[in-house]
Amino acid sequence: MGWYCLDRDHNLILKLYIQPGARQTEAIGVHGEELKIKLAAPPMDGKANRALAVFLAKRFNVPLKHITLKWGAQSRHKVVEIYQPVNGPEVLFNEIRAE
């Protein structure tokens, strides 16, 4: 599968490794079979999960309600579904290359 795939309904499934409490929120690169994302939010009271959803909604140009955390609510390893994204997963790599 790698770090992403499309399901039969063309929803994007992402496997992510999250590093909360970072200086800024950004995609870093591939970490094993997951994409590593640093989050500026702390890992408490769902703040990091909320920051992740907002980050992904902006990058994939979808409403926040189209981002679903499928697995890993209290883990650094997460699986996220993005319902019918406007942009493909390459938007995260474009961000990495721009640095």
Curated annotation (Swiss-Prot):
InterPro entries xref list: DUF167, YggU-like_sf
Query: From the record, what ranges are coiled-coil?
Result: none
- List GO terms (cellular component aspect): cytoplasm
Question: What's the superkingdom here?
Answer: Bacteria
Which protein family is named in the record?
A: Belongs to the UPF0235 family.
Extract the PANTHER family matched here. UPF0235 PROTEIN C15ORF40
The name under which this protein is listed is UPF0235 protein Neut_2146
